[in-house]
Structures are given as C-alpha cells and as structure tokens.
A protein has these predicted regions:
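PLP-dependent aminotransferase class I/II
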Residues: 1-140
Length: 140
C-alpha cells in the first residue's frame, strides 16, 4: 500500500520484525471525502473484512487504571516504591489517542494469511481508494 494516496500505513522501524495480529491503517479524509467508517463499509462490500475503530476508550479510562484495581491484594504496580500515585490521565492528555481509536481501520491478521492473501487484500484496498479518489464524497 506504499504510495497509495490517502492511505496512511503503520510506521515500521528498520530492522524490526513485526508479528502482526491486526493490520491497521488510517485514511486522509480530505483525499477521499468520506469518513473512515464509510471507507470500511466500502472495503466490506468488496469482501475485505475491515472494521473502523479499535477499543471504545483509551486504557486510562478503564477501572483497572482509574480505580487502581489489581489482581489480588498486591496493589502492584501502584504500591511499588517508584510508583507515582498522584498521576491521573484524561482525554485532554491524549487527543491523538482519542482520535486514533475511532478512526483506525482494522482487520484481524493471523498466521493463516498467505502472501497471496495479502496481495489480494492490498489490491482490494487500492481499488476502493482509487474509486473514492476519483469520486470524493460519493457513496460506493
């Protein structure tokens, strides 16, 4: 998908071997004139199983973090000497995280996906991207 206008792929560090369990990317809504959810729907119509959105809330919104709940009674990590108990996180601390969680396009990925499958998926994504680039804001 490198070089496909409007497709923003995950960053990959040189020399790092990835073990994908999901494949994700975002789109430039200005290029396609549609939302990520609409792009995901168009992919699904092509038989490409992408959804839009990851988890509903950032990790710091969950009770395990907010209420410092732990498994058992250890209190770890909040009882460790280096813990900083006064730290609290809010949506204002992570606006990019909030945006990303609702805009990322995601497909489950596993060891059963072959190189041929990956090429077929890329071909379908390119097809949808090309259509919306030529017909921005249109409904597929």
């Amino acid at each position: 998908l490198a070089g496909v206008p409007g497709i923003i792929r995950p960053f990959r560090y040189d020399g790092v071997v990835h073990s994908w369990w999901i494949y994700s990317f975002t789109i430039d809504e200005g290029v396609f004139g549609i939302s990520p959810r609409e792009f995901a729907s168009a992919l699904q119509a092509e038989g490409i199983p992408f959804g839009c959105g990851y988890i509903p809330n950032p990790m710091f919104d969950y009770p395990v973090i907010q209420e410092r709940k732990t498994y058992g009674t250890s209190g770890i990590p909040w009882t460790l000497p280096q813990a900083r108990p006064g730290i609290r996180y809010s949506d204002d601390d992570a606006p990019n995280t909030i945006w990303f969680l609702s805009h990322v396009l995601i497909m489950s990925w596993n060891e059963g996906i072959t190189e041929s499958d990956a090429m077929d998926l890329a071909k379908g994504i390119k097809k949808v991207a090309a259509w919306f680039k030529e017909n921005p804001g249109s409904k597929a």
